[in-house]
Structure formats: C-alpha cells, structure tokens
C-alpha cells in the first residue's frame, strides 16, 4: 500500500509540473494585461493581444514615456522546432504562446489563466503574473 501512495504522490507532483492552461486565440484577442509580479519601481509593464500580435508595453513612471514592442504570435499545444508564420492569425487552441525573436522560437507557457489573471513561464525560466485590465 505504501508503494501505491508513493507512486501516486510522484504522479501528482509530475502532473502539477506539466499542467498548463489551454486557451484559444479568440479568447486572448482584445485583452489587455498589467504586470503585477515581479513589479518594478521605475516602470509599469503590460501586454495586449490581437489575433496576430502580442504587444508588450513599458511605461516609465518618471517621464511617462511609453514604449511598445509588438510581435507576431500564435498558440500551440507544444513547443515547435521552427516558427510557422502560416499559423499567425488563426484561431488555434494551445497552452504555449509562440513568438519569433532573434531568428529563433521564443515561447511562453500559459501556466494559469482566469477571468482576472494570467501566469506565464518564459523560455528563459521567468514566471510573470499579469492582471486583466480589459
């Protein structure tokens, strides 16, 4: 009986680690998010989505200057080897936001999403939490 509990415990931990949220492009379309973790003292960060573009924003508190970084994206259920631009703008379901950065695939895993919050894990290992603005 002890072995069963041990196996179950390991299975439970593994399933937690692999758990990701599936979402459709149409559900992200038109949404706007504000970064709530990690928070910066000098800069407000956010992101917004259209069907084709994920735009990250940085607004500096001191001089109120805002910078926008729009990048094409698509959703995928796994991490692709190459960026498939034919998938941009299609209403796909997936737990990964796939982008093309510096000639290679960059991804964010959607760890959790609710009507008010989204948690992303990046290819670099950073976890960010955003609160929904609209």
What are these regions (language model features)?
Residues 21, 133-134:
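Short, solvent-exposed mixed-charge patches
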Residues 1-6:
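Bacterial N-terminal signal peptides that target proteins for export
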Residues 7-15:
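Bacterial N-terminal signal peptides
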Residues 125-133:
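Short, low-complexity, Pro/Ser/Thr/Gly-rich segments in the mature regions of secreted, periplasmic
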Residues 30-47:
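Start-of-domain marker
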Residues 38-43, 57-115:
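Contiguous, well-ordered beta-strand patches that form the walls/edges
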Residues 19-32:
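N-terminal helix-cap/turn-to-beta initiation motif at the start of protein domains
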Residues 52, 114-118:
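Ser/Thr- and Asn-enriched, surface-exposed coil loops between beta-strands
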